[in-house]
Amino acid sequence: MGRIRQKIKVDGRESWTLFDTGARNTYVVPEVAVLLTTSKLKDPFRSAIGGEHKETKATALLEAEVEGRRISTHAMIVDEMGRDEEGKRIEILFGALAMQQWGIRLIPEEERLDLSHYPEEFVGVKYILDIDPSAGS
């Protein structure tokens, strides 16, 4: 497991972020969520963050800049995630699924992110349907 801490920009606001390969999902606190598109959940989800159980009643579409590169990913909204080793409040916990989605790798020994696998373009898949005009007649 690796962890890197740094600020990322959400709607121009810098947010203290913990990139953590030991966390599957991504989480944001309400102060960040107010800058995002959110939706309420029909039923709450429960997660364990930092050894504590948290309840999520809403989710957000996290659109942000990581070292100048745009990302967009799904995030759970939780009231609090605690503080890092330096006592700074964690506002975003960027999990392994989002890191994989955006080609973000951690270099813990240098305390930095590796964005060399960031997708510069997205390739769509074209589906071709062979329709037999005589079928179903």
Model segments located where?
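Pepsin/retropepsin-fold aspartyl endopeptidases
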Residues: 1-137
